[in-house]
């Protein structure tokens, strides 16, 4: 056997060292990385993607746009992504009715990088961030990564955000950063603007990061409308990974007062957005009307799934996003496995008794509902008796 084959058979170089052997920061020991299961199954409803593929016109535009910049790949991209940010400002001005300019926008590789940059600029050692749980699991992970102390306040029993209770928690803890997701992931509820005003008025210092990753699905107006009212306190983050069907393109952005963008520029890495990403995202924005045409279809499907699951005896949390949180299961992890055994991948988000399912294509949702009808007879805390 050759030496190369012996090495391949023995395993990767350096495997004798474990994570415990490394000089890792003490505050990161024992932590777990983010990760939704990536499994090859017939029905994948676990990562809240838009199930509708891009149109051929969009594919052709992305291909042509990338081809146009390919000849310049030996050069660094536009460091500040001015053209892309200008296009994003135009899109949001049209969608929200709030006049925005390039100075109000910043873009990065997914909204998680946006959140990380915000925590680098406004969080860090000696500072704190508060979240209202259950909510997006990356908020505490990014806080840990930037050595920002993570504080927790609970949502109501129905997972909604009680503005009065949340304001009291802010008043008591006085965090430097307040995280609010609207619609909330994993429960799906939106937060009305009046409730956000209550939180912002309570804050004596710091910023409120309003995570609108699922904003295009929401029945509530965007908090972008409040930026001019609270320019030193409010930052709105969004993504093209959900409604925009651009998850593979990895493009997130924030909307804020120009001074906030100036702050982020202090911590961003140079040339962080590739020429290819910028070109592809601009092409996607040119086809916004066609792509977002699927939003109404997904909302209708979400409502159909909600009604059907409710009729089967499940408790379904009313959702303003492209997913539903449902239960109440006697053993959610075990039920998650039974869905997987049936070829359906949904998400165990760590809430006892509940699982989350993305709204898929009609035929995918039919498979989910068929399996759910069978599981309702055995998996719920109060199983529905089978009909003879």
Over which residues does each language-model region extend?
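PLP-dependent aminotransferase class I/II
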Residues: 55, 233-310, 314-317
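Conserved PLP-binding catalytic core of the aspartate aminotransferase-like
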Residues: 298-299, 307-342, 359, 386-388
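PLP-dependent enzyme catalytic core of the Aspartate aminotransferase-like
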Residues: 2-3, 194, 334, 338-342, ...
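Short Gly/Ser/Thr- and Asp/Glu-enriched loop/turn motifs at secondary-structure junctions
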Residues: 40, 102, 317-323, 350-354
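Short beta-strands and strand-loop turn motifs
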Residues: 46, 150-154, 176-183, 208-211, ...
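Conserved core of the PLP fold type I
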Residues: 72-203, 214-230, 235, 294
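N-terminal small-domain helix-loop-helix segment of the aminotransferase-like
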Residues: 6, 14-110, 117
């Amino acid at each position: 056997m050759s030496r190369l084959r012996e090495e391949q058979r023995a395993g990767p170089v350096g495997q004798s060292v474990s994570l415990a052997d490394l000089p890792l920061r003490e505050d990161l020991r024992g932590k777990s990385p983010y990760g939704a299961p990536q499994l090859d199954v017939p029905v994948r409803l676990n990562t809240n993607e838009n199930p509708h593929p891009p149109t051929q016109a969009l594919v052709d535009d992305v291909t042509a746009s990338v081809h146009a910049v390919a000849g310049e790949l030996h050069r660094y991209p536009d460091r500040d992504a001015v053209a892309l940010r200008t296009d994003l400002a135009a899109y949001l001005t049209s969608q929200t009715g709030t006049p925005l300019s390039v100075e109000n926008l910043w873009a990065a590789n997914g909204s998680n990088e946006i959140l990380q940059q915000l925590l680098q600029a406004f969080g860090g050692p000696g500072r704190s961030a508060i979240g209202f749980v259950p909510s997006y699991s990356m908020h505490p992970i990014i806080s840990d990564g930037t050595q920002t102390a993570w504080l927790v306040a609970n949502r109501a029993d129905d997972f909604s955000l009680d503005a009065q209770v949340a304001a009291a928690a802010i008043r008591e803890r006085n965090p430097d950063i307040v995280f609010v997701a609207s619609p909330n992931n994993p429960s799906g509820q939106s937060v009305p603007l009046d409730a956000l005003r209550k939180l912002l008025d309570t804050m004596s210092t710091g910023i409120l990061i309003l995570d609108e990753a699922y904003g295009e699905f929401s029945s509530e107006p965007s908090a972008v409308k409040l930026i001019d009212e609270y320019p030193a306190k409010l930052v709105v983050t969004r993504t093209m990974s959900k409604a925009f069907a651009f998850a593979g393109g990895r493009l997130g952005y924030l909307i804020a007062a120009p001074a906030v963008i100036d702050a982020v520029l202090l911590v961003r890495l140079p040339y962080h957005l590739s020429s290819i990403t910028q070109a592809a995202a601009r092409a996607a924005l040119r086809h916004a009307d066609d792509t977002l045409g699927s939003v109404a279809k997904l909302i209708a499907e979400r409502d159909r799934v909600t009604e059907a699951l409710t009729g089967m005896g499940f408790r379904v949390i009313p959702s303003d996003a492209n997913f539903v949180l449902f239960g109440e299961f006697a053993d959610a992890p075990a039920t998650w496995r039974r869905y997987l055994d049936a070829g359906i991948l949904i998400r165990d988000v760590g809430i006892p008794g509940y699982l989350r399912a993305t709204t898929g294509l009609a035929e995918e949702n039919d498979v989910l509902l068929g399996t759910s009808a069978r599981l309702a007879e055995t998996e719920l805390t109060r199983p529905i008796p089978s009909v003879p």
